[in-house]
């Protein structure tokens, strides 16, 4: 019985560790905060830590955005929420064909540090990722 309780506690800990954790700005490395401030001056943010990276969530020019940083301050990507109707036609067609009866809850444009653009469609609790032309790439848990 003791082994079962210990095992359950371990699994629960691992499960919670896999999700993003909100953190106080004071716990964000100064290199990350400096990099964010250079790219988005004067913007207030909320911070989360997930898989060793720091995610800033904020609003800029009326857009809901987020930016992902390595511990050393290197930004790896930014994400801007967009209207579902602004997703490429190929994304809409893919979802219609492969998720019959489901609707896209949210859309986003992802820009990687190297300038590569991808799109994200949240469908049925999952993030469906597409390239810049709307070609399906992968599904991630939401």
Task: Go through each PLM region and give its residues.
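Mature soluble domains of exported/periplasmic/lumenal proteins and thiol-rich metal-chelating peptides
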Residues: 21-142
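Bacterial Sec-dependent N-terminal signal peptides
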Residues: 1-23
């Amino acid at each position: 019985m003791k082994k079962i309780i210990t095992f359950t506690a371990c699994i629960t800990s691992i499960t919670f560790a896999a999700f993003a954790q909100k953190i106080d700005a004071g716990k964000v490395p100064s290199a990350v905060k400096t990099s964010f401030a250079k790219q988005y001056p004067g913007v207030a943010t909320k911070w989360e830590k997930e898989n060793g990276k720091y995610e800033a969530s904020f609003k800029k020019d009326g857009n809901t955005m987020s930016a992902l940083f390595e511990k050393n301050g290197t930004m790896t990507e930014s994400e801007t929420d967009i209207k579902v109707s602004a997703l490429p036609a190929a994304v809409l067609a893919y979802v219609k064909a492969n998720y019959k009866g489901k609707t896209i809850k949210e859309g986003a444009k992802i820009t990687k540090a190297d300038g590569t653009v991808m799109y994200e469609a949240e469908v049925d609790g999952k993030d469906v990722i597409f390239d810049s032309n709307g070609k399906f790439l992968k599904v991630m848990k939401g």
